[in-house]
C-alpha cells in the first residue's frame, strides 16, 4: 500500500469517527454534559448523599458504644473532730484508773489517686422507633430521586430546545443558500434581458437589492448560529469548535399517547413517597411510651499512691500517739459490672404526642399538594395534546403553502425569461417561497417542541425518539 493510500484511509477513518454520530447520539452527549454542569441537578445529587448518611446513622444506633475514661489527681483532705472525755475504771491492784480528757484534733489525708473506666453499651430494642424512621428515610430518598428525575427532564427539554434551534438555523441557512442560487441564476437572466431591452435598469436594480437583502439575512444567520454555539458551550462545557461541527437534522417528531395517566410523573411519585414517609414518621413518634432496652458493661480501676495520713495531736491522749503514716500503694482492680437496663417514659410532657400531630399536618399538606398537582398536570396533558394536534395540522398546511409557492416561483421564472413578468414579480415570488420554506421549518420546530412537552406530560421522554 502506498503512502498516499494510507493517508486517504486514515483521513477517511478520522472523518467517520468525527461525524459518524447520529443526531440522537449527539443530543445525548450534549445532555449528559449539561447534567454534569447543571447546578440544581448536582445540588439534588448532593442532598441524596445526606439521606444516605442519615440512613447509616440510624443503622449505627444498634452498634456498641465503647468509652474509656480516666482521671489522675491529687487529694488533700482535712477532718476536724473533738474526741470525748472518758474514764478508764481502775483494776486493783493492777491499774488505779484514769480520766482521758477531751481534745480537739485534725486528721489529714493527702496523696495521689487514679481512676479509669472502660464502658460499653448497646441498644437492644428502641421501641420500634428506629425501624419506622429507617422506612421514612427510605421513602424520603425515593422522593428525592423522583425530584432528581424531574430536574433531569428539565435539562433534557432545555438542551433539546437549543439543539432544535440550532437545527432550525442550520436548515434556514440551506433555504437562504437555495434562494441565493436562484437569485444568481435570475440575475444572469436579467442581465441578458436588460441587454435586449426587455427590462428597465430599475427592474435590474430590484434584483440587485434582493441579493443585498439576502446577504443581510446571511449575516443575521451567522449571529444567531454563534449565539446558539455559545449557549451550548456554556451549558455543556463542550468545545465551541466541536459544537460548530454538529449538523443537526430537523425532522417531524411523531408521538402517540398510549397511556394518558399522569401518575408516572416524577412530581406525583415524589409526593407519594413523601406521604409514605410522613406516615412512618407518625408511627415513629407514637412509640415514645414503649420501653427502650440497653445492655451495658464496665471494667473499672481505682488506685491510691503516696498517701500520707497524719493527725495534729494524739489520737487518744496518753494512749495513742498522733499519726504520721506513709502508706503503700493501694489499688482496686478489676471492678466488673454487666447488666441489662431499660428506660420507660411514662409521661414525656406530651412531647411525643405533639410531634405526631405535626407529622400528621405534614402528611395533610403533602396530600393537598398532590391533589393540586394532579389537577394541574391533567390540565397540562390536555393542553399539550391540543398543542401537538395543532402543530401537526400546521405542518401539513405549511407544507402545502411551500409547494404552492414553489410552483408559483417556477411559473414566474418562466414568464420572466419571456419578458411577460417584471423583476418585482420575480422577487415577490422568491420572497414568498423563502418565507414559506422558513415557516415550514419553524412549524417543524414548533411541532417537535409540542411533541417533547407531550412526552414529558406522561413521563415518556426518550432521547432515542428525538
Enumerate the predicted regions with their spans.
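Sec/SRP-type N-terminal targeting helices
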Residues: 42-46, 59, 110, 124-152, ...
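Periplasmic alpha-helical coiled-coil/stalk elements that build and connect Gram-negative outer-membrane
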Residues: 3, 29, 53-55, 154-269, ...
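Acidic, low-complexity, intrinsically disordered peripheral segments
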Residues: 76-80, 85, 439-466
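Bacterial Sec-pathway N-terminal export signals of envelope proteins
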Residues: 20-78, 239-240, 244-283, 290, ...
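Short flexible linkers and secondary-structure junctions
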Residues: 22-161
